[in-house]
Amino acid sequence: MDKYKKLIGNSFVFAIGNLGSKLVQFILVPLYSYTLTTKEFGQADLLTQLVFLLTPLVSLELFDGVFRFALDELPENKPQLISSVVGVLSVSSIVCLIIGGVTDTIFSNFEPLLTSGFLVANIWFALISNYARATGYVKVFAIAGILNTLIMGLTSFVLLSVFRQGVQGYLIAFIVGLCGAVVYILAATRMYKQISFKYFNSAKLLELVKYSAPLVPNYFAWWLNSSSDRVFILTMIGSAANGIYAMANKIPNFINLIAQIFSQSWQISVVEEIKNDKSDQFITTVFEVFCGVLFLAGILIVTWIRPLFKLLINHNYFLGWKLTFIMVLAVIYGSVSIILETVYTASKETMIVFKTTLYGAILNVLLTVALIPLVGYYGAAIANTISFAVVVLLRLRGIIKRGLLKVNYRKLATYHVVYFLAAALPFLLKNDVVVIAFGLCICIVIMITDKNMLNISRKLILHKELK
């Protein structure tokens, strides 16, 4: 199967899985709003964020290590890989549940035991699903994502609407959904046949830890780079400004969803191709097309943003549309940095990933503190954009030095110029229809003149080999 077709095919499968899950989550919002008080939902959301924050720390990001190593491990060695991690995570899971049980007797209002159960279930789902994805069970991985949210949704309905279990029901639903998805993956892939403590290999485990350990602080640095702006706006300006800022970021996050879906298939493809003599051609082509797609999406968003705010968003947040063009650029840079990160993880150079993320996070905090007093929440958006741009430049420099990527600087500069022209249209023209028409014309011209986009699209349609 041609590498480009495989990349796009996997992306399509992951898109179905991700969008299906997002749809179920969207449908659940009214259920939560009618069955949980604002206090209960606030507590439930806080516990959920805590679980997602603790998952990399408690697991040492070993599920990412399993994914990377399983992609190029010989079939006879894969049982050692998965069994070694299962052994370690079994111990850490037991410790988590014991701690949760003990603290539950003291702080029962915060549901420590159920939160620990949610954390353990989330870790095991991450491990089992990533191993399935790495060993070729892409469709099983996608179905498991949908199944997880479906089971969680049905359980939420029963526990919240029928039995009125509140926060406890909310957490139990997550646990049941994750466990159901894990059971499905184990059954569909027969992975359980590869798991045995007799395959435990301490040397293999140490190799995994060396790879995964830098990804733990990287996760927290990335979180700081992405979320610290909200904290500073809240403390330095106020909750109203933070609300406008948060709302302005909702629509640009659509680009982030595109990047997340694509990165799931890109991780597989880049590991398979990086040892190839012509890997630089593949990485360069994908990088150029991906950047083009991101800027196309960005241009559409900034030219549609004003009418979208008028139609979909409460008038109290209307000023947020003026922030969007900066936030879209930040999301584009953040998405590009994720794709570049994958090239480093494919080469098992995770320490560089951590260092570049850390530099961006430090710069983001310093710029945010300096700019907010000068230009308000625009300063936070500008700081976010600059910090992600620096991360991209640092990662690009390293990848270019390794001969894995050739950057068409003229094309990237053109994308930026065209983007800023499109972003200026809503500020210069009052007629939304005219702005949208200009935006569509710009996108059509880019698609027609971009040779890589045209080549990949034409060959895929004609089912020809891509070169």
Label every PLM stretch briefly:
Residues 1-3, 139, 167, 171-173, ...:
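Interhelical loop/hinge segments that connect adjacent transmembrane helices in multipass membrane
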Residues 3-63, 97, 149-153, 157, ...:
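Signature of the first transmembrane helix
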Residues 9-21, 46-104, 109-110, 277-297, ...:
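Membrane-water interface segments that mark the loop-to-transmembrane alpha-helix transition
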Residues 10-25, 148, 173-181, 185-189, ...:
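Transmembrane helical elements of multi-pass membrane transporters/channels
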Residues 11-21, 79-80, 116-122, 132-157, ...:
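Alpha-helical transmembrane segments of multi-pass membrane transporters/permeases
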Residues 70-87, 244-357:
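Specific pore-lining/lateral-gate transmembrane helices of multi-pass inner-membrane transport
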Residues 113, 143-191, 359-363, 377-398, ...:
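Hydrophobic alpha-helical transmembrane segments
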Residues 426-467:
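Membrane-proximal transmembrane or re-entrant/amphipathic helices at the cytosolic face
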